Amino acid sequence: MPRVKRGFKARRRRNKVLKLAKGYRGARSKLFRSATEAVDRALNYAFRDRKVKKRDFRALWITRINAASRLNGLSYSKLIHGLKKASVEIDRKVLADLAVSDPQGFSEIASVAKTQI
């Protein structure tokens, strides 16, 4: 079996990691071993935080809806309960956007929820 020289493949693999580490401070962008650790950690954080982002946005929407619904004399849970009973299928993202951009429209939706409680 002939000898395999892997210089090109190894260099390409290292350069790929160093390219991902571009912009990191100090040795983390220059030395392969430090760059590998930094890139692995960064990719792990990125994977985890793509999931956390969804939770954070949902919590933000709920906070905004709660603040707007309390201005209309309802708690968040009562508002959602009333909307479910009234078969209003507006998700929390849209409700939060309405609460911020169109308070008058949100108060109309809140009045629909109030009638169902």
UniProtKB/Swiss-Prot annotation:
InterPro entries: Ribosomal_bL20, RIBOSOMAL_L20_CS, Ribosomal_protein_bL20_C. Binds directly to 23S ribosomal RNA and is necessary for the in vitro assembly process of the 50S ribosomal subunit. It is not involved in the protein synthesizing functions of that subunit. It holds the Pfam family Ribosomal_L20. One of its GO terms (cellular component) is ribonucleoprotein complex. NCBIfam families: rplT_bact. PANTHER family: 39S RIBOSOMAL PROTEIN L20. GO terms for biological process: ribosomal large subunit assembly; translation. Coiled coil: none annotated. Belongs to the bacterial ribosomal protein bL20 family. Keywords: Ribonucleoprotein, Ribosomal protein, RNA-binding, rRNA-binding. GO terms for molecular function: rRNA binding; structural constituent of ribosome. The keyword Ribosomal protein applies. The keyword Transmembrane helix does not apply. SUPFAM superfamilies: Ribosomal protein L20. This is Large ribosomal subunit protein bL20. Transmembrane segments: none annotated. The gene is rplT.
